[in-house]
Structures are given as C-alpha cells and as structure tokens.
C-alpha cells in the first residue's frame, strides 16, 4: 500500500547526472529486440524440454556476474549523487544484538524504530537488502554485526505451502551455511 498509494516527497535525480552511466545505444538495441505488438514475433516455441533446460542453466553465468556489475554502478551513482548504496546496507548500533532484515518501503519505518531504541540504549540494527537476486551471502554476512544474537526477517509476500517466505529462507540458508546456527531467527510478514 505504501508504495502504490502514498504521497511522499522524493528527490528526483537529474537525467544529465546519470546519462553518462548508461550506454543509450545498448538500450535502443534492447528495446528494438523487445516484444512489440507492432512487430510481432514468436520466441521460445522452437525448443524441447531438454534444450530449454540447457538454456536456463547457461543463464547462471550471467546471474553470477550481476552483483559485481550492480556494485560498480552503485559506486558510480554514490560518487555522482552522494548516496550510499551497496548490495546490503547496515543501519544501527555497531554492536547490535537484535537485527531486522528487510527490503523496500518498510526500511524507512524501521530506521525510525532503530533511532528510537538506540537512543534508549538498546543494541539494535537493520540490514537493508538492495539487491535481492542473485542473493550474495558474503555481502550479507559482511554487514551483519558479529555481535548479533537475534534476527527478524520481514518479508512482504506469502508463499503458500512453503517452510518460509523467500527472504527468510535466504537468510536462514546463509546463516546455516556460515555456521551461525546459534543466532535465533524469526520470520515475519508486514504486508502483501
């Protein structure tokens, strides 16, 4: 609701500041190749299941390279506009024992809660997810305070029949594979 119905002040980035970061010829070529009702074309109808499977697996290399590309452009945006975007951003006490992990519109509210609680001496923090897919466990663990004892993951989706919602499962897997089984992990949902 907040992202679709709320009126909020925003800072608009000047196109001139960002245009040098984008190859507009590549954008035009991409758009020319996109599906268009004025120039209809069929795609994907010429593969059997075995070939389709191979093509889906071949895409993995592109997905694996994506985080480095995103970080490169985040650094350019940060330098140009004075922002501080990373794959994951941490906000809160350096020695936090309780941390929220979330993405999207809830982060603004969570920051206010973190400010309120840290002012009262509580050791709390927030990990903001900026790039969700592909999930980069190493980058997540890098920003998670070493002092954390409890993590609450806030999802904004419902996966019927699943053991947990997507962000929760990614955090759970990351903590488990890093040997951080002693951290108490809780999942929650703040909307759909």
Indicate residue ranges for each PLM-predicted region:
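Short beta->alpha junction loops
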Residues: 128-133, 187-191
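Peripheral docking tails and interdomain loops at the edges
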Residues: 150-192
